[in-house]
Amino acid sequence: MARVIIIGPAHPLRGGLATFNQRLAKAFADEGHESSLLSFSLQYPDFIFPGTTQYSSEPAPENLLIHTKINSINPFNWIRTGNWLRKQQADLIIVRFWLPLMGPALGTILRRARKNKKTKIICIADNVIPHEKRPGDKPFTRYFLKSCDAFITMSEKVMSDLRLFEKTKPALQVAHPLYDNFGAILSKTEARIHLGLPADEKIILFFGFIRKYKGLDLLFDAMSLPAIKNTGIRLLVAGEFYEEEKGYQAQIDQ
């Protein structure tokens, strides 16, 4: 049995990373390992968070130990958390990396944790080069990557981005697993009835947070082309705006 600690967002934080991390912790536990999660007491300051809320309204997952400790903007917290993590004597730390802004906090925590000369650190890199560039991206990313022993990516693009920064450490590309924790699978017919959608209509689904880099504006432009309009295809947008809605609404009105 190994002792595994997963570092990244977890309940009460919401989003895909939290869902993934919690399911991964359960998978380790199901295999007989001791698993827990180390999450954030402060992930993003409110003034830089573009959505409505960082927190989930869902109940906490059962049978998962979640330590809510990391303050992403407090260096004193990084040292305390790193010292705590070092004392846990984990066999394996799995850390998520998705944004250079997290590099200083996570890199410092991991450097202190690995001083126990026991713990191995594997990074699951969701992004290495961010979708939206900011000052400090490259040094923050380098600082973080140097604290890891090996890497997992879930796309060829992220793997190639990783190799721009880290050319020699072991890295493996795997497919993003399918989630199995959202209830029973519905057939297309059942799902359409539940959502009130016509059974035989052709539908394109845009699903998820709405941010500029995701290209919803380009999809709207494409849907307005006569060659598309004449097909009778319908666009269904299901997501939360992470930026001003006005521009998108103007496109719809046109």
Segments from the language model and where they lie:
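N-terminal subdomain of nucleotide-sugar transferases
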Residues: 1-45, 49, 59, 88, ...
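Short donor-sugar binding/catalytic loops of nucleotide-sugar-dependent glycosyltransferases
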Residues: 10-12, 207-211, 226, 240-242
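Glycosyltransferase donor-sugar binding loop
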Residues: 40-44, 233-249
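Short N-terminal targeting/anchoring amphipathic segment
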Residues: 66-71, 80-104, 119-120
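Nucleotide-sugar donor phosphate/pyrophosphate-binding loop at the beta->alpha transition
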Residues: 117-122, 128-147, 156, 160, ...
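Donor nucleotide-sugar binding/catalytic pocket of nucleotide-sugar-dependent glycosyltransferases
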Residues: 146-186
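A short helix/loop element that forms part of the nucleotide-sugar donor recognition site in Leloir-type
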Residues: 183-197, 250
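Conserved donor-binding/catalytic core segment of Leloir-type glycosyltransferases
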Residues: 198-214, 220-223, 236
